[in-house]
A protein has these predicted regions:
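Mature extracellular/secreted ectodomains of secretory-pathway proteins
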Residues: 65-192
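Compositionally biased, proline/threonine/alanine/serine-rich low-complexity intrinsically disordered stretches
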Residues: 186-210
Length: 210
């Protein structure tokens, strides 16, 4: 019994440290919800591949500019490509633009925005942060469908984002090879209204959910 007690005390102490650390991390995250949009301010430590990125604070972007960015996000099915579709319809972009504008102004140094938008077709989830000349959009889920683009086809591919004028994919270099990440868009901060007239997701049949 005398041997067990110190061991139990040590295990309890370690568990308490991890619990307190986890609570502190959660306490740092602030969440706001309105009109189906939920925004969380998260630490930059949660992002990957941003070591050489210089973030911009404060983030002052006009409502019209954010609306242009939302309307310029298009996606396409990988296995059975069809005409690209809007991630956000015009009505949704107009509704969300002022919310993103307000939220971005509230981002403090060392933070970025994680967002989810819940609609009748499912959940759309992503991250957004701003650098000197660009807005970075990382989309993980569209209408409830998780992004998958495995070149080895171990997991069935789903969709990819489609670039428009003023946008580029993020590229990662690992082991001498460069990889294009097609669910991450880097867009000029002063992106104009999109010229492409792709149909919105409200008028185009969506691909089956995985």
């Amino acid at each position: 019994m005398t041997v067990r007690h110190p061991l139990i005390a040590k295990i309890f102490s370690l568990s308490l440290i991890f619990f307190i650390g986890g609570c502190a991390l959660l306490k740092e995250e602030r969440t706001f919800s309105k009109s189906g949009l939920t925004i969380t301010f998260r630490s930059l430590n949660a992002l990957d591949d941003v070591q050489n990125i210089r973030f911009r604070y404060p983030i002052i972007v006009s409502e019209a500019n954010i609306r242009n960015h939302l309307l310029s996000l298009f996606y396409q099915d990988i296995v059975s490509p069809r005409q690209p579709r809007s991630v956000f319809s015009r009505s949704v972009a107009s509704k969300l633009a002022p919310l993103f504008k307000t939220a971005l102004k509230k981002v403090k140094p060392g933070k970025y925005l994680h967002f989810t938008y819940r609609a009748s077709r499912g959940l759309t989830e992503g991250q957004v942060f701003v650098t000197a000349k660009n807005i970075h959009w990382r989309i993980f889920k569209i209408n409830g469908v998780i992004y998958s683009n495995d070149p080895l086809r171990i997991r069935e591919p789903t969709w990819k984002l489609v670039r428009t004028h003023g946008q580029s994919y993020q590229r990662l270099r690992t082991g001498g090879f460069e990889k294009t990440i097609k669910n991450r868009i880097i867009a000029n901060i002063n992106l104009p209204f999109p010229k492409h007239k792709y149909p919105s997701r409200t008028t185009t049949k969506s691909f089956p959910r995985k």
